[in-house]
Amino acid sequence: MPLVEETSLLEDSSVTFPVVIIGNGPSGICLSYMLSGYRPYLSSEAIHPNTILNSKLEEARHLSIVDQDLEYLSEGLEGRSSNPVAVLFDTLLHPDADFGYDYPSVLHWKLEQHHYIPHVVLGKGPPGGAWHNMEGSMLTISFGSWMELPGLKFKDWVSSKRRSLKGDRVMPEEIARYYKHYVKVMGLQKNFRENTYITSVSRLYRDQDDDDIQDRDISTKHLQIEKSNFIKRNWEIRGYQRIADGSHVPFCLFAENVALATGTLDSPAHLEIEGEDFPFVFHSMPEFGAAINKGKLRGKVDPVLIVGSGLTAADAVLCAYNSNIPVIHVFRRRVTDPSLIFKQLPKKLYPEYHKVYHMMCTQSYSVDSNLLSDYTSFPEHRVLSFKSDMKCVLQSVSGLKKIFKLSAAVVLIGSHPNLSFLKDQGCYLGHKSSQPITCKGNPVEIDTYTYECIKEANLFALGPLVGDNFVRFLKGGALGVTRCLATRQKKKHLFVERGGGDGIA
């Protein structure tokens, strides 16, 4: 039974949860699934192609993966995540996927309701998070099967909708619908609250040396979940919920643990240059796509400036190119830079992105020629400023400056999470505490097996916040957090059963 009413968070401002999850994208959904008692076991007929890992799995076949030593299981595994549990869980769900194989998962899932840990998932929109806001005309970078969550194959869901997959990659809107349906079919709705906006998350008291040092004002205010199990108010979460009539109703919750699953798409990164706030400068694909769809750029002679060398910038290039809008494409790297994402994508699977990369290499600007009619790339260039007359100033790596008249500009150089509800915007949680949190450059620093923040006990982070930008890998975060919380819950039960303390946390 949910701890608060389905329609509202605010009826009882004294409610305390063992876990509050902030963010209802795939990270938050997967964590809710596992906290609800779903447990992964090695399938009876399964043989993992990695013989060493398979031997380890056989040693404890009777135990769920949640109850096993994740450090031991993940030792020696390699993959496209810096977090070992993410690599482990991915290789269990998609064995040898990076070698081009489509082996079935070696896991099967059981619902064990006695493992349920009460929690609430707070999100701004419907379950699926930012996937509901992505440009619908572009294909996902990952295969549909890599976007799926445990227990419901994406292809099976598509078949149930009487639709067929035209290829392995799918539209973001399909993925968004899948995530929303997943929450419903898995019976997770009671844990989710939509239209919620967090304004502050603050610690009420701190532990010292892992002993319970309590704030005397709040030490007796706890919610009893079971007869012998009390939870502590480590965190206060404040915010508001937007209700049907558009009004905002404030709420206040308390939690023993908070899990940050916000993703990193909230705040587009800026160049921080003169004129960047002019209305002709966009910072997201939805903005740019809307301008094209509304015909604002139709028939324009002046080119669109696109800044960035990632896949979102490539999407913008394709969007403009396919709409017959000339493009100036500016990026700071060399086209031969081995870290360019295009070099990591097979040509057969991603022909449209390799088309962009081919243009980046072969249609670059030179001082001896004018702009090409459809597309011109400017490798190793940066934008110095935007002018009110819709001009921009570019500078090459050698210092040469050029001025161009534009019809619009799109700056797509990454994004930052909105962690304004944390002290110092959450910067103190990162590897570089003086810089904003980013997926690649400065992720949240965590224990890589529990996903607990190094700088803050009882605060967890998963998904893009810790560098796992692909859905394939963020599921490992849910496994790490669930194992950590389940282990602590067992210790708490054991402590009470043996007569330790007075039962008040």
UniProtKB/Swiss-Prot annotation:
It comes from Homo sapiens (Human). SUPFAM superfamilies: FAD/NAD(P)-binding domain. The lineage of its organism: Eukaryota, Metazoa, Chordata, Craniata, Vertebrata. Belongs to the OKL38 family. Its main location: other. No monooxygenase catalytic activity in the absence of NADPH. Keywords: FAD, Flavoprotein, Meiosis, Monooxygenase, NADP, Oxidoreductase. The keyword Cytoplasm does not apply. Monooxygenase catalytic activity. May be involved in meiosis or the maturation of germ cells. InterPro entries: FAD/NAD-bd_sf (IPR036188), OKL38_fam (IPR029731). It is found in: Midbody. GO terms for molecular function: growth factor activity. Its cofactor is NADPH. Ubiquitous. Expressed at higher levels in testis and ovary. One of its GO terms (biological process) is negative regulation of cell growth. This is Oxidative stress-induced growth inhibitor 2.
